[in-house]
């Protein structure tokens, strides 16, 4: 008995997949054996349809009818056709992952926004083009579309580039266009998160679904259902489910997962119990007629693929499969909600080792290796638990001399977040540089102040790379450091204090620790009013001296020889106040240090390089979490 068979009498069971799943045979086999529906996690969002190059090359030709490309969507559609698996289309209209240039005159971000009628014409043409391509070339494959995604925020319509340029009725227009061009058998959905919250539930029912139902433009409500172990309460969720169901619309559970950062047996049992409780709720609502649930989709296949580890900044174990397609207790709990125990068999994936290898995607010839930057007798941070700070290399396998990027992940000085390591390193590797990720000293317990140890780590790392410049093929080239969040504080500390850090090892004493350039991403800068308190506490302890606070308040420490800096952050950053980047930029200006400073209006803290891999939930580079995992097991 598998999931799709157990739930066939009631509703479709699906999973979201990324391009990495699609190119890993074991994952596609798991999908085909267990599920009868899937969603493309990332590659069918607006930015992947809109052809930037074509539209910018001939803006007059495409002014009212943007050029589209389907190269990202086609592999998923082909897989669905070949394997006879139905698809949910996700998503046509969203405030995220829709390029700003789509809204601008001549498709140029440096031009003013186009007028309402122009943007509506573009929207209609875009929706028509996507639906026509899919329905002509892959008829019957996509059974439902998320037409509009996530337009409600803080008890009102979300302020977005759509409301700024078109107005709050943009979602109605989108549904009008979708209804006009969708095949009769295709269902049209509104999709959102936190849909069980009473304030959001009521607003969606009245202001979003109400007018769409009145105009007969909508067929279903999508409840994303990114759940926590203690939120929402099942009764609150059930109430919302039944209230949406009372509209007569189909209900899809579109992005189901349950964030859980504890992999212990006890915690995974609790996860299983909660999954069974929710699936029992779905079945009860379906059988009683209180909600016409027609599809439930898990938001990816395996724990290791989940977007939550990057989003939550900690490893998450939120799904029902893990590792080599192994079934967790939660898998059997989901089955038990639908069928009797005696009809449930143990799931044993019969896949070869070759099936677990990425296939069909170009893989660069990268020299990857790790090297400790300290000898054991040089490094004595008391809460290291056997960890030694190290560099992980991403080098081109050739003899070409290249510039070097040293990446410093963030993590509040509590950890080195994996999604802020390898993703960034590979971005620069793909642009022709050699790259390294530094796993520096952190303290997940926040009990043993780090003081200058992270600064000494990055100073040694710069010297270590330069000492081995010939081996790494970077001799005579620039070495730039790039940090994220607290990792930016590490980078910034070196930028202003490189002269202070003396290396006692004679092999490194005469090697410069000054980087040639610095990139600071959503940086922690100050220890003053706008500080990130947890970072400062982990670094300096609960009772730092005034001298320590001043030393590590980087806006007060800029020198005449501070390297050139590139700084970026978002206005919406809710973790590190945007004033941090302004403070450092102003200090650089006063010292006449070359710099660039960008503050983007939208975007959350932790965006890293915001590329396809990031938004698909892939992070890689788990090696950066070594000290944290050692501490976890030790403490």
UniProtKB/Swiss-Prot annotation:
Its EC number is 3.2.1.8. Keywords: Carbohydrate metabolism, Glycosidase, Hydrolase, Polysaccharide degradation, Xylan degradation. Gene3D superfamilies: alpha/beta hydrolase (3.40.50.1820), Glycosidases (3.20.20.80). The active site is at 150 (proton donor), 255 (nucleophile). It holds the Pfam family BD-FAE. GO terms for biological process: xylan catabolic process. Pathway: Glycan degradation; xylan degradation. Residues 1-337 form the GH10 domain. It comes from the Bacteria. It catalyses: Endohydrolysis of (1->4)-beta-D-xylosidic linkages in xylans. GO terms for molecular function: endo-1,4-beta-xylanase activity. Belongs to the glycosyl hydrolase 10 (cellulase F) family. B.fibrisolvens is located in the rumen of ruminant animals, where it contributes to the animal's digestion of plant material by hydrolyzing hemicellulose with its xylanases. PANTHER family: ENDO-1,4-BETA-XYLANASE A, GLYCOSYL HYDROLASE. This is Endo-1,4-beta-xylanase B. It comes from Butyrivibrio fibrisolvens. The lineage of its organism: Bacteria, Bacillati, Bacillota, Clostridia, Lachnospirales. The gene is xynB.
């Amino acid at each position: 008995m598998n999931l799709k068979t157990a739930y066939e009498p009631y509703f479709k069971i699906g999973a979201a997949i990324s391009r990495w799943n699609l190119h890993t045979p074991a994952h596609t086999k798991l999908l085909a054996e267990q599920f009868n529906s899937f969603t493309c996690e990332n590659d069918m969002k607006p930015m992947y349809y809109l052809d930037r190059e074509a539209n910018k090359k001939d803006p007059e030709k495409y002014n009212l009818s943007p050029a589209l490309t389907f190269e990202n969507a086609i592999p998923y559609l082909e897989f669905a056709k070949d394997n006879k698996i139905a698809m949910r289309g996700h998503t046509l209209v969203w405030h995220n992952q829709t390029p700003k240039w789509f809204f601008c005159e001549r498709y140029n971000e440096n031009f003013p926004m186009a007028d309402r009628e122009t943007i509506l014409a573009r929207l209609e043409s875009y929706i028509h083009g996507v639906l026509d391509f899919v329905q002509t070339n892959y008829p019957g494959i996509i059974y439902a579309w998320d037409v509009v995604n996530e337009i409600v925020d803080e008890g009102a319509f979300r302020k977005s580039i759509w409301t700024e340029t078109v107005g709050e009725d943009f979602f109605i227009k989108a549904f009008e266009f979708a209804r006009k061009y969708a095949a009769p058998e295709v269902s049209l959905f509104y999709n959102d998160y936190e849909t069980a919250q009473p304030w959001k539930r009521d607003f969606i029912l009245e202001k979003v679904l109400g007018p769409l139902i009145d105009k007969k433009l909508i067929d279903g409500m999508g409840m994303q259902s990114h759940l926590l172990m203690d939120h929402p309460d099942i009764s609150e969720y059930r109430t919302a489910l039944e209230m949406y169901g009372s509209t007569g619309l189909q209900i899809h559970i579109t992005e189901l997962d349950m964030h859980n950062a504890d992999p212990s047996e006890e915690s995974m049992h609790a996860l299983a119990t909660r999954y069974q409780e929710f699936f029992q709720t779905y079945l009860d609502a379906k059988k009683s007629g209180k909600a016409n649930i027609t599809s439930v989709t898990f938001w990816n296949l395996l724990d290791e693929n989940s977007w939550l580890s990057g989003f939550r900044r900690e490893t998450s174990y939120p799904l029902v499969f893990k590792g080599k397609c192994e079934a967790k207790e939660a898998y059997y709990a989901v089955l038990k909600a639908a069928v009797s125990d005696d009809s449930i068999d143990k799931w044993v994936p019969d896949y070869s080792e070759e099936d677990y290898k990425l296939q069909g995607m170009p893989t660069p010839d990268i020299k990857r290796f790790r090297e400790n930057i300290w000898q054991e007798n040089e490094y004595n941070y008391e809460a290291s638990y056997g960890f030694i700070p190290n560099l992980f290399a991403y080098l081109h396998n050739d003899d070409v001399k290249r510039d070097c990027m040293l990446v410093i992940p963030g993590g509040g000085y509590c950890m080195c977040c994996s999604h802020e390591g390898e993703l960034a390193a590979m971005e620069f590797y793909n642009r022709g540089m050699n790259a390294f990720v530094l796993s520096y000293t952190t303290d997940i317990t926040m009990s043993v102040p780090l003081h200058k140890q992270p600064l000494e780590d990055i100073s040694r790392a710069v010297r270590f790379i330069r000492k081995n410049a010939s081996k790494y093929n970077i001799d005579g080239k620039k070495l730039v450091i790039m940090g994220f969040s607290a990792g930016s504080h590490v980078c910034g500390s070196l930028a202003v204090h490189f002269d202070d850090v003396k290396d006692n090892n004679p092999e490194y004493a005469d090697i410069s620790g000054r980087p040639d350039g610095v990139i600071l991403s959503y940086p922690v800068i100050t220890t003053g009013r706008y500080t990130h308190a947890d970072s400062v506490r982990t670094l300096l302890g609960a009772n730092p001296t005034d001298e320590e606070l001043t030393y590590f308040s980087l806006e007060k420490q800029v020198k005449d020889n501070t390297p050139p800096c590139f700084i970026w952050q978002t206005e919406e950053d809710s973790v590190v106040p945007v004033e941090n980047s302004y403070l450092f930029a102003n200090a650089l200006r006063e010292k006449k240090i070359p710099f660039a400073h960008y503050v983007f209006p939208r975007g959350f803290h932790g965006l890293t390089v915001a590329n396809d891999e990031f938004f698909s939930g892939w992070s890689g580079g788990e090696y950066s979490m070594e000290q944290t995992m050692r501490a976890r097991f030790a403490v």
